[in-house]
């Protein structure tokens, strides 16, 4: 599971790393939480060009009655992307990358828990695999862009912290993940520990 993450880099860093023309202004945070708005990278459905937008964490499908639905959809299990009603349309049409400086997991028992930060070994960002949706408020008609982070089975040391981990897309595969026609199976395989640094938060 990924329930908190760190995005402490500024918009200029995201723009350069993810090769987008601009990034909306946002406040860098060491503790991004569900329902908060943060940058995502997507392919614009009209221009078919890569861009960054601000979106709300917690995917809300177009058919959902209200934004509360998103609290159940902060993570999307990779095993259910094709079958789950909440995710299958977005998986076929609306993939995104979620820029993070690191993400967090906890170990230990209640009252004695240790918070761990998992971050890239040799680059400023992870690009986490995500899906995005646009939901329209039934009262105002205002659009709300939302997203979820795709998870897979954890491997290596991370498996000792949690049985799930985000799908981390390496920079050479960003374009492939953003292309919904691409179904390369290696896109969905957990990265090796060699590319990760795990440290007390």
Regions found by a protein language model. Give the residues of each.
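Short linear sequence motif anchored by a di-proline
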Residues: 1-201
């Amino acid at each position: 599971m990924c329930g908190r993450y760190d995005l402490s880099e500024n918009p200029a860093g995201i723009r350069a790393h993810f090769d987008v023309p601009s990034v909306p202004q946002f406040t860098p945070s060491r503790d991004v939480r569900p329902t908060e708005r943060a940058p995502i990278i997507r392919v614009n459905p009209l221009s078919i060009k890569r861009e960054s937008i601000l979106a709300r964490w917690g995917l809300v499908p177009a058919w959902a009655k209200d934004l509360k639905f998103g609290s159940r959809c902060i993570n999307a299990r990779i095993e259910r992307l094709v079958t789950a009603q909440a995710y299958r349309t977005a998986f076929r049409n609306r993939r995104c990358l979620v820029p993070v400086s690191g993400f967090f997991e906890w170990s230990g028992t209640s009252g004695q828990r240790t918070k761990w930060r998992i971050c890239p070994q040799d680059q400023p960002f992870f690009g986490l695999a995500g899906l995005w949706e646009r939901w329209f408020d039934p009262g105002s008609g205002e659009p709300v862009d939302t997203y979820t982070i795709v998870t897979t089975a954890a491997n290596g040391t991370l498996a000792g912290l949690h049985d799930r981990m985000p799908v981390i897309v390496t920079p050479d595969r960003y374009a492939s993940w953003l292309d919904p026609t691409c179904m390369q199976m290696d896109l969905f395989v957990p990265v090796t520990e060699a590319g990760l640094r795990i440290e007390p938060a």
